[in-house]
Amino acid sequence: MSEIKLIVGLANPGAEYVQTRHNAGAWYVEELARICGVSLVADSKYFGLTARAVLHGKDVRLLIPTTYMNLSGKAVGALANFFRITPEEILVAHDELDMPPGVAKFKLGGGHGGHNGLKDIIAKLANDKNFYRLRIGIGHPGDKNKVSGYVLGKAPAKEQELINAAVDEAVRSTEILFKEDMVKAMTRLHSFKAE
C-alpha cells in the first residue's frame, strides 16, 4: 500500500455549517491537527485550510477545502498536483449516510454514493476513484427526499456524542495507520461501535 501523504476533511465553509452532519470529515481533520500540535491555516492557493503535520515520523498534509462541498475537488486537485500526490496517497474523510452514528470505517476506492464532495474529487482526479476514504457514520433520515436537510442539520446531542466518539477512534486508528499499516488500522476501527 502507498503511504498516505494527504488527509482531507470534507465540509461546507461558514459558521452556520460548522456543527452540521455534512462537516464530519472536517471534525476528524481538526482533531488530527490538534493531536499533532499544528494549526490549520487558510491558503488561497489550495482553496482551503491546510497544515503540514508529522505522524510517527512521516510527513502528511492536512486539508479542509473552503470551497462549498460540491467543489471540494478543486482544493484536493490543486494541493495533490502541486505536491505530486497520487490518488492512492490520499485519504478523504466524509460523512456517511449508510452507516449509523458511532461507527467509522476506512475504505479504498469505490463510487461516490451520491456524496457531492466525493463526486467532485473523483472528477478532478481525472475520474480516478482509487483513493482511500474514511467514512464517518451519521445515519439516514429514512427518506431520500429528506437527505439534503438532514446532512445540513445538526445532530441531536446523543447522536453527536456517538459521532464524536467515532471521530476520536478514527484519529487513534490513523495513528496506527502511520505507525504500522492500513490493515491494523482497519482491524481496530472496524471493530469499534460507540454506544
UniProtKB/Swiss-Prot annotation:
Q: Where is the active site?
A: H22 (proton acceptor)
Q: Gene3D superfamilies in the record, alphabetically?
A: Peptidyl-tRNA hydrolase
Please list the reactions this protein catalyses.
an N-acyl-L-alpha-aminoacyl-tRNA + H2O = an N-acyl-L-amino acid + a tRNA + H(+)
Per UniProt, the keywords (alphabetical) are: Cytoplasm, Hydrolase, RNA-binding, tRNA-binding
Q: State its Enzyme Commission number(s).
A: 3.1.1.29
SUPFAM superfamilies in the record, alphabetically? Peptidyl-tRNA hydrolase-like
Site annotated as Discriminates between blocked and unblocked aminoacyl-tRNA: where?
A: N12
Which GO biological process entries does UniProt record here? Answer: protein quality control for misfolded or incompletely synthesized proteins; rescue of stalled ribosome
Sequence similarity:
Belongs to the PTH family.
Q: Briefly, what is this protein's role?
A: Hydrolyzes ribosome-free peptidyl-tRNAs (with 1 or more amino acids incorporated), which drop off the ribosome during protein synthesis, or as a result of ribosome stalling. Catalyzes the release of premature peptidyl moieties from peptidyl-tRNA molecules trapped in stalled 50S ribosomal subunits, and thus maintains levels of free tRNAs and 50S ribosomes.
- Protein name stated in the entry: Peptidyl-tRNA hydrolase
Q: Which organism is it from?
A: Shewanella oneidensis (strain ATCC 700550 / JCM 31522 / CIP 106686 / LMG 19005 / NCIMB 14063 / MR-1)
**Primary gene name:** pth
